[in-house]
Amino acid sequence: MAAMASFDWADPLGLDEQLNDEERMIRDAARGFAQSVLQPRVIDDFAAEADASELFPLMGEAGLLGVTVPEEYGGAGASYVSYGLVAREIERVDSGYRSMASVQSSLVMY
């Protein structure tokens, strides 16, 4: 009988081993921001139906907006995988915050 494959509930798709060092660094920074800045306020923002526009400068300072925009235009010049990782970490807290970041990151490209 074959041995059972191990399963990692924290990383069920084995994503972490597929990331390069830069992608891990960006993911970890996004996770830190999401947990320290977004998580503490999400329930109050949701209850107040607040737009939380004061988060845009904070997200920008943290490098979470325009992740794929080239550095010469003020972005990080990172990969689309990195952008997806940032979105995933923000989404982990709230889809509304992720929508805010995604829209702003997309609008800057045009």
Question: Model features per residue range: what roles?
Answer:
Residues 27, 50-54, 75-83:
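A structural motif shared across PLP-dependent enzymes of the aminotransferase-like
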Residues 40-61:
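Short secondary-structure junction/hinge motifs that connect adjacent elements
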Residues 19, 48-52, 97:
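Residue-level recognition of alpha-helical structural elements
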Residues 32-37, 58, 62, 89:
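Generic non-transmembrane alpha-helical segments
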Residues 20, 44-46, 76:
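A generic secondary-structure micro-motif detector
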Residues 18-37:
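Mature N-terminal segment immediately following signal peptide/propeptide cleavage
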